[in-house]
Amino acid sequence: MSSPERIFPGKYYLCLEPVKSMLKTKKMKSVIFNLLIITIMTCACTPKNAQDPAKWSDSEVKSWFDKGEWKQGWAVAPDASIDQREFAIQYHKNPEVWNKAFTFLKSTPLDTLSKGRHEIDGDFLYANADQYTTKNEEVAKFEAHRKYADIQYVISGNERIGVRPLADGEITEDYVDAKDVLFLKYADKNYQAADPGKFFIFFPADAHSPGVKADTNMVVHKVVLKVRIN
């Protein structure tokens, strides 16, 4: 076979070099473009599934919850009544606000909180602190909310909190939008002990009856963080 020099002698052969280089460049660009498309599609799909707790298995939900990074270093334990999957779903919808909530609980000297509302992030997140005497079971009411989730923590003292599914209750007072509350009653109250060693989280599907006396009526110092979810 004849060499390129014999077919295209001298300067004519040299003119082919840019053409050959351009062909190589176009081929390389095509390869790079295809790789970019594959990478973008992979990145677009994988994180979406990874960050959608509604699609996680029960073991994946438990692993994420038990790891506890979402607590932002707050040492208090979550109560076993917390709906772990619902919390994972709500957390991943708005991690910034939930992180602010637990950072507040970790970094604030809670025993110094005065009664009333404490601003954190406007109507998206705020804390209500209160001091009250626990009430007898017969006068306690179950309540539920639609716009906010509650993080409830007894700073000092102890009480019981009834925890029941909203769907199982009988409504005794209709929902009042201005107060974001409705009231219900249940035959089975399912009381859980609440003390400084653990905290509770209640979502719209969770009816709860806080402030019920444990062994005796006592003064309780408590903080409730209101986290906007709807």
Annotate each predicted stretch with a short phrase.
Residues 165, 204, 227-229:
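Short, structured patches in soluble enzyme cores that scaffold and shape functional sites
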